[in-house]
From Swiss-Prot:
This is Phosphatidylglycerol--prolipoprotein diacylglyceryl transferase. GO terms for molecular function: phosphatidylglycerol-prolipoprotein diacylglyceryl transferase activity. Its main location: membrane. It comes from Pseudomonas fluorescens (strain ATCC BAA-477 / NRRL B-23932 / Pf-5). A 1,2-diacyl-sn-glycero-3-phospho-(1'-sn-glycerol) binds at residue 139. It is an enzyme of class 2 (transferase). It comes from the Bacteria. Pathway: Protein modification; lipoprotein biosynthesis (diacylglyceryl transfer). The keyword Membrane applies. PROSITE patterns: LGT. Belongs to the Lgt family. The chain crosses the membrane at residues 10-30, 56-76, 92-112, 120-140, 174-194, 202-222, 237-257. GO terms for cellular component: plasma membrane. Catalyzes the transfer of the diacylglyceryl group from phosphatidylglycerol to the sulfhydryl group of the N-terminal cysteine of a prolipoprotein, the first step in the formation of mature lipoproteins.
Amino acid sequence: MLPYPQIDPVALAIGPLKIHWYGLMYLIGIGGAWLLASRRLNRFDPTWSKEKLSDMVFWMSMGVIVGGRLGYVLFYDLSAYLANPTLIFEVWKGGMSFHGGFIGVMLAAWWFGKRNNKTFFELMDFVAPMVPIGLGAGRIGNFINAELWGKPTDLPWAMVFPPFSDPAQLPRHPSQLYQFALEGVALFLILWLFSRKPRPTMAVSGMFALFYGIFRFIVEFVRVPDAQLGYLAWNWLTMGQVLCVPMILGGLGLIWLAYHRAPAKSAAQ
């Protein structure tokens, strides 16, 4: 069994102001995505300035934050937030939905593209390889918060999470680290290498949706579902898996369309 590193969720406290690691992970993810996007900016559109890139990253980041929070409220715990709406704003306590954030990013991409003469999939293909940076950083934030841990296990890398998080004090799968490895590291490598060469429009977006959906679906088997939802069916199906099914099918559909439709301008990522 591996020891769980005791890390204070508050990274810095200045008087009443508290800066949480969870929030810092979002900033690190957004900053890392911007740096990587700036490296490929000339390949995407030589006429774009760093300022325009920053504008795009800003609006997509707003889509992640607002969509992620609203997605969690709608998909995972609607009744609790209806009973106490002020809880919606307590984002430092966790409670973000990837699928909600993904919808938020798509809406931001559509809106920004309409105003900058870019199609929806041109922007999505460009940003997709950068998204795993934010996903990986977010999973580290989950780990520091000692949330979203896995089922009990006797594997040698099991961890006992703090009593405030897991009163049962059982050795568990560190499922946040599994997701960091798959959604952050593995997905980044797949998309970064795949997009090094020009690909048909929609291909990179399809790869992102497909592999994220697969990775998340797999990890959900060892991750404990949200207590207020539990399993939706068969004592194993979770809300996360249900939301991943359309991503997997949509990803396959996008890849098929990208390579079988009439020839179109290739997207150089």
